[in-house]
Amino acid sequence: MTEYTRKIKGGLSEARPATSEIQEIADKVRPLLEEKTNEKYEKFKAIEYKVQVVQGLNYFIKMNVGRGCYLHINVLSGISSENDLELTGYQTNKAKNDELTYF
């Protein structure tokens, strides 16, 4: 947990540009997302993210999935261990300028 995430307990952080760590989180849940949406994404690039500190970390990540399409994913991390990731939700048919919100 970074110093930044320690400061926001319970609330949703401001949007931040995606880092390599955020891309890695997204990549780990990609197979499950593709199974749930019945899609194979040609591109899967994390653009930005917000974090909510709960018992673990709740990541809301905006993904560019190619052809001008975006989606938002919600990934819960750290409930049973730091490496434990759970895809807890997703929103399809999003636009580049759609704000990440709690869902």
Swiss-Prot record:
GO terms for molecular function: cysteine-type endopeptidase inhibitor activity; endopeptidase inhibitor activity. Gene3D superfamilies: 3.10.450.10. It comes from the Eukaryota. It is found in: Cytoplasm. Keywords: Cytoplasm, Protease inhibitor, Thiol protease inhibitor. PROSITE patterns: CYSTATIN. GO terms for cellular component: cytoplasm. InterPro entries: Cystatin_dom, Cystatin_sf, Prot_inh_cystat_CS, Prot_inh_stefin. SMART domains: CY. The record marks 10 as: Reactive site. A motif (Secondary area of contact) lies at residues 52-56. Belongs to the cystatin family. This is Stefin-2. It comes from Mus musculus. The gene is Stfa2.
